[in-house]
Design a protein with these regions (language model features):
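Mid-sequence acidic-hydrophobic segments that form the walls
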Residues: 90, 125-132, 150, 154, ...
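N-terminal polyanion-binding entry modules of DNA glycosylases/AP lyases
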Residues: 1-142, 146, 204-237
């Protein structure tokens, strides 16, 4: 699970800047008018900082964010954090680079909590980054849809994984995670639906949030956090 960030801000970054305050004010005002359902979620949280949750994570580049997302597939946030801490311990207190992960003993990665399938996915991704088939600088400069197409070509990496990385590592401001079970439940509660919305229904609702879908999503996730001590697993890879 991820929370929306102002543009250009990734995990582990909490430095204040004037442009951020301006951006938040503009985005909140836009969302209040665009979707009355979001207005009380915004107004009831005047001190809500959409970067606060991210600040609990170590600084992540694109590979680190994808590692975090892959590790978190089908897991709660708490379980993902535990796995991440064990992985960091294997690499001297930091997330591994692609080269470091390729050099690691897969058995140790398994003991850290990664499934064999996830290890295979991460090694495949690390190999593509290490041998030049994928260039992280080029990837980071791509529009969301092109980056999605490049990364979802890798077995084990689906839209949910990439969507989270877009927010965590790149601070993309117009991202929504329609396959996330917690978000779908949050939408059901906020919109008082009598059913769990499917992905397409979430996307249809989220159209009115453009170009601030990441921030709108963060408010809904915040409401979900407040209703439960932990977050259920995502429904998507």
């Amino acid at each position: 699970m991820v929370m929306g960030l102002p543009p250009g801000k990734g995990a582990g970054q909490v430095t204040e800047d004037p442009s951020r305050a301006t951006w938040l004010q503009q985005a909140r005002s836009y969302l209040r008018q665009a979707d009355p359902v979001l207005a009380p979620l915004i107004d009831d949280r005047p001190d809500f900082d959409p970067r606060a949750w991210m600040a609990q994570l170590p600084p992540m580049d694109l590979y680190g964010a994808l590692l975090f997302q892959v590790a978190g597939q089908q897991l709660s946030v708490a379980a993902t954090r535990r796995t991440l801490a064990r992985i960091e311990a294997l690499f001297g207190g930091h997330l591994p680079s692609p080269a470091e992960l390729l050099a690691a003993d897969p058995g140790q990665l398994r003991e850290a909590g990664l499934s064999w399938r996830k290890i295979g996915t991460l090694r495949d991704l690390a190999g593509r980054l290490s041998d030049g088939r994928l260039d992280p600088d080029v990837l980071s400069s791509l529009p969301d849809d092109e980056l999605m197409a490049q990364l979802t070509a890798i077995p084990g990496i689906g839209p949910w994984t990439v969507q989270g990385a877009l927010i965590i590592a790149l601070g993309r401001e117009d991202v929504v995670l329609p396959g996330d079970l917690a978000l779908r439940k949050a939408v059901r509660a906020a919109y008082q639906l009598d059913h769990l919305p499917a992905e397409q229904e979430v996307l249809a609702i989220a159209e009115k949030w453009r170009p601030y879908r990441s921030l709108a999503t963060s408010y809904l996730f915040s409401a979900a956090f407040e209703r439960t001590a932990d977050v259920p697993p995502s429904a998507r890879p």
